[in-house]
Amino acid sequence: VHAETSTGAQSDAKSLVEIAHKYNCLAIVDSVTSLAGTPLKVDEWEIDAIYSGSQKCLSSSPGLSPVSFSERAADKIKRRKTKVQSWF
């Protein structure tokens, strides 16, 4: 979670992504409350997957979810060998 509106807390997404990559993990950022409201440099920070919601900081109609995947994440998804067992 990049930011939390009820407390005003914001994580250091850049550092968390660096830690994930250090251990060869993908980094996912929940930017529902931060996209368009605070600096968020998806390409520069090399975020692998990021999603948001239109109803929060974007202040738009609810029901839309902007999503972006890096080439690294897309490649990992394409190479998946097992089906997703559950979406819940």
Tell where the protein language model's regions lie, with residue ranges.
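Short, well-ordered, mixed-charge alpha-helical segments that flank or form enzyme active sites
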Residues: T5-Q10, L35-P39, E44, L58-S61, ...
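Alpha-helical scaffold segments in soluble metabolic enzymes
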Residues: S15, K41, G53, P66
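Poly-acidic low-complexity segments
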Residues: D12, K41, S86-F88
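Conserved active-site segment immediately N-terminal to the catalytic lysine
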Residues: D43-Q55
